[in-house]
Swiss-Prot record:
Coiled coil: none annotated. Keywords: Ribonucleoprotein, Ribosomal protein, RNA-binding, rRNA-binding. PROSITE patterns: RIBOSOMAL_S19. The lineage of its organism: Bacteria, Bacillati, Mycoplasmatota, Mycoplasmoidales, Mycoplasmoidaceae. InterPro entries: Ribosomal_uS19, Ribosomal_uS19_bac-type, Ribosomal_uS19_CS, Ribosomal_uS19_SF. It comes from Malacoplasma penetrans (strain HF-2). One of its GO terms (molecular function) is structural constituent of ribosome. This is Small ribosomal subunit protein uS19. GO terms for cellular component: cytoplasm; small ribosomal subunit. Protein S19 forms a complex with S13 that binds strongly to the 16S ribosomal RNA. It comes from the Bacteria. Pfam families: Ribosomal_S19 (PF00203).
Amino acid sequence: MSRSSKKGPYIEPSLMKKVQAMKAADKKKPIKTWSRRSTIFPDFVGLNFEVHNGKSFVNVYVTEDMIGHKLGEFAQTRTFKQHTSNRKDLAK
């Protein structure tokens, strides 16, 4: 279920302060965040984020196509363990 349009998109206030400080200083240092629920705003385009996936931080470079999505969508929390196949099929 999506958020009500009357409320508007959510962004962590501390994250917005960090983004504004980075824009003002023209720095390219990645912004480390645990806020996976924050919506990507147009101000974020061109910035690097390190989004926590529960175990480590994943580098996310924000492009224009990502606007409106959540930061957590680009930092996968689960790794896919590939199913093993028969060894006889691999030998052929």
